[in-house]
């Protein structure tokens, strides 16, 4: 019998044959006398791989061909997959590593593995079965040899490569596909026995005693000892040092401080506080509040005594400085009410003498901090209209009336035609009229005939303050009228002289 070639499996590294034939490798024939192929090839009956498709209607398999049964079956008959041909197993890719040619002699024990010869896959009508012995299977010496020639093995696998183990017949029965390390390299120390695992007890925590801080000073005047050089004893609980409380001592100490409060109280009338034009600049002064009650121990009394002396000295110094450092508003108030008291003192029977008898004031030069536009504080003799209450001077009578209404009488003769709100000044009314969207405002313009009427109204409103507040104003208006008449006569005479000269 002639020597027939045998087949060996070589993978396709580029994967070109995979697209054409559906598998990874191809088989090539090589001459070898050790393997023979039977002259009469074993023919296998071609078995259809795919069964004819059936039309699915309503989830049931209905055959396309006519069956001898009267009606189609209700359910598709169960098909056992194990009863099919063994050729369907060839549809899956082999799980063995790539095989290479080996010159190992044929062993006594060999196994036959059916492999088709045709490169066209499973469509061959007469497949040829070839036998490959297990001795031809060459395991790679290192894990890096597992990779095809086109790929590069990682450097880790190359560095950790070990010599191939010896293969025995008993090992061939086991599908061991990767080299395993020898059992001699097994180290018992690498394993961990769970019985030897023990939980270490935590280290005991040392409990330190709490740090004893000195007690805080209470709010009952204990801070005076530390601030003003009192006797400071060792830090002990306050209960051992505090003496029983005496109600009489508390009242006595408050009575000592009560004298200092009277120095800071200013007895102003209610009209001063209700005046919207006045300002009080007393916020800068420090409020003198009474200290909290203190205990009656001898050491504390010695430390508190110099405090009261210092307070009284400070109050005396402030009393001496108040006339010089008096603000402009306070001077205005003292001058205003001082002039009223002086006017009332001339007439003891007037009702205002009783009303302002409790107020004491002295006339001071009227230096006033004015609000709004900046005005001259010097006494201008050209301002002929003088207010008899605050002795302010004005150039026009309208200015004096406006000042008198806004500050002294608070009369509001100007009323809004839309909402009826009243104002003491006409400019305030014009500004208010812009809210309603109308620029035109009807103002009651005063004529010469209406001056006495307004004067009589002011006299009625101010009758309780002064007997005749507008006597000076009326005399001034008469004098100013005479001056105006004289100036007009002089102008006319000058014109006549010019005409006569011509």
From Swiss-Prot:
A GO cellular component term found in this entry reads: nucleus
Signal peptide start-end:
none
Question: Which SUPFAM superfamilies does the entry mention?
Answer: beta-beta-alpha zinc fingers
- Please state what the protein is called: C2H2-type transcription factor MSN2
* Phenotype upon loss of function: Leads to significantly enlarged and swollen the hyphae, with an increase in septa and a significant decrease in nuclei. Remarkably decreases spore yield, spore germination rate, traps, and nematode predation efficiency. Increases the expression of the arthrobotrisins biosynthesis cluster.
Extract the GO molecular function terms from the UniProt entry.
DNA-binding transcription factor activity; RNA polymerase II cis-regulatory region sequence-specific DNA binding; zinc ion binding
Gene3D superfamilies in the record: Classic Zinc Finger
The alphabetized UniProt keywords are:
DNA-binding, Metal-binding, Nucleus, Repeat, Transcription, Transcription regulation, Virulence, Zinc, Zinc-finger
**Zn finger residue spans: C2H2-type:** 385-408, 414-436
Functional description taken from the UniProt entry = Key downstream transcription factor in the HOG1-MAPK pathway. Plays crucial roles in the regulation of growth, conidiation, trap development and fatty acid metabolism. Negatively regulates secondary metabolism such as arthrobotrisins biosynthesis.Also regulates autophagy and endocytosis.
Q: Where in the cell is it found?
A: Nucleus
Phylogenetic placement of the source organism: Eukaryota, Fungi, Dikarya, Ascomycota, Pezizomycotina
InterPro entries per record: Ikaros_C2H2-ZF, Znf_C2H2_sf, Znf_C2H2_type
Q: Name one GO biological process term.
A: regulation of transcription by RNA polymerase II
């Amino acid at each position: 019998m002639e020597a027939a070639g045998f087949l060996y499996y070589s993978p396709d590294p580029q994967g070109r044959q995979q697209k054409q034939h559906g598998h990874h490798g191809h088989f090539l024939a090589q001459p070898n006398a050790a393997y023979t192929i039977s002259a009469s090839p074993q023919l296998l009956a071609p078995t259809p791989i795919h069964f004819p498709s059936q039309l699915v209607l309503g989830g049931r398999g209905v055959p396309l061909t006519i069956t001898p049964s009267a009606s189609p079956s209700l359910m598709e008959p169960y098909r056992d997959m194990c009863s099919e041909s063994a050729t369907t197993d060839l549809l899956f890719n082999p799980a063995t590593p790539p095989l290479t040619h080996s010159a190992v002699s044929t062993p006594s024990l060999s196994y036959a593995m059916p492999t088709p010869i045709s490169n066209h896959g499973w469509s061959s009508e007469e497949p040829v079965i070839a036998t490959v012995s297990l001795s031809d299977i060459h395991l790679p010496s290192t894990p890096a040899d597992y990779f095809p020639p086109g790929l590069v093995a990682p450097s880790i696998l190359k560095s950790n490569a070990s010599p191939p183990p010896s293969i025995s017949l008993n090992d061939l029965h086991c599908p061991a596909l990767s080299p395993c390390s020898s059992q001699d390299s097994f180290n018992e120390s690498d394993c961990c026995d769970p019985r030897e695992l023990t939980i270490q007890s935590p280290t005991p925590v040392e409990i330190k005693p709490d740090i004893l801080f000195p007690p805080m000073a209470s709010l009952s005047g204990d801070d005076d000892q530390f601030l003003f050089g009192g006797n400071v004893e060792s830090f002990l609980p306050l209960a051992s040092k505090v003496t029983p409380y005496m109600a009489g001592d508390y009242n006595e100490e408050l009575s000592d401080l009560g004298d200092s409060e009277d120095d800071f109280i200013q007895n102003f009338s209610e009209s001063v506080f209700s005046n919207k034009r006045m300002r009080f600049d007393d916020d800068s002064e420090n409020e003198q509040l009474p200290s909290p009650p203190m205990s009656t121990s001898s050491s504390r009394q010695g430390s508190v005594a110099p405090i009261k002396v210092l307070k009284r000295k400070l109050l005396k110094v402030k009393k001496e400085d108040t006339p010089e450092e008096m603000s402009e508003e306070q001077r205005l108030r003292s001058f205003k009410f001082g002039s009223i008291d002086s006017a009332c003192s001339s007439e003891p029977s007037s009702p205002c003498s009783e009303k302002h008898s409790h107020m004491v004031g002295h006339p001071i030069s009227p230096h006033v901090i004015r609000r709004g536009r900046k005005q001259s504080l010097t006494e201008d003799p050209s301002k002929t209209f003088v207010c008899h209450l605050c002795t302010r001077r004005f150039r026009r009578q309208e200015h004096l009336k406006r000042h008198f209404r806004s500050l002294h009488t608070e009369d509001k003769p100007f009323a809004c035609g839309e909402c009826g709100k009243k104002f003491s000044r006409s400019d305030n009314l014009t500004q208010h009229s812009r809210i309603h969207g109308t620029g035109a405002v009807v103002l009651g313009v005063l004529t010469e005939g209406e001056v006495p009427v307004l004067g009589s109204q002011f006299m009625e409103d101010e009758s309780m303050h002064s007997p005749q507040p507008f006597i000076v104003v009326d005399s001034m208006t008469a004098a100013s009228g005479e001056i105006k008449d004289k100036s007009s006569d002089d102008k006319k005479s000058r014109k006549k002289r010019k005409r006569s000269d011509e």
